[in-house]
């Protein structure tokens, strides 16, 4: 389960969850990009950002010692040169922007994972309450015969208290994230 309502097309432009704004166009294809694995998606995005940063850095950097020797013979540069402190400030700003973009994607991935976990937990709680309601309706007072096999010297049990229902077991989840969530919050159902 990826947390999407079944009526909506995953990854489409109109993919908006109840109460959440639609994903930006650049992120709309991310929902099913890697089978719902946000950690994998985060890793791919991080690699892509790192490669893009390296390519843009290589395009800005001179060609090494060969360029330096040619520049000494050619005189001043043909185009207007920015001051070194401005270049370093722009490089620092670019680096910070890439870091912020990666942090933003990481937080988005974590938020989406949390949303999916909450939805799974809601479904689990609804299933448990349904089982408890079903169990209590099966053990209601109307299901007991008038004479429950008691002898004359035994007192009948209090009719206002239902008998103890059999213990309910929580269905085992096959999702490691759900198990982590239960372990992290020490949820015992």
From Swiss-Prot:
Keyword terms, alphabetized:
Cell projection, Cytoplasm, Leucine-rich repeat, Phosphoprotein, Repeat
Q: Where is the composition biased (Low complexity)?
A: 67-83
Residue ranges with Pro residues bias: 159-169
Q: Which residues carry this modification: Phosphoserine?
A: 28, 188
Q: Which GO terms describe its biological process?
A: establishment of cell polarity; negative regulation of SMAD protein signal transduction; negative regulation of transforming growth factor beta receptor signaling pathway; positive regulation of cell migration
What GO molecular function terms would the record report? transcription corepressor binding
- The segments carrying the LRR repeats are 86-114
* Subunit architecture: Interacts with SKI. Interacts (via LRR repeat) with CDC42BPA (via AGC-kinase C-terminal domain), CDC42BPB (via AGC-kinase C-terminal domain) and LIMK1 (via LIM zinc-binding domains). Forms a tripartite complex with CDC42BPA, CDC42BPB and LIMK1.
Q: What is this protein called?
A: Leucine repeat adapter protein 25
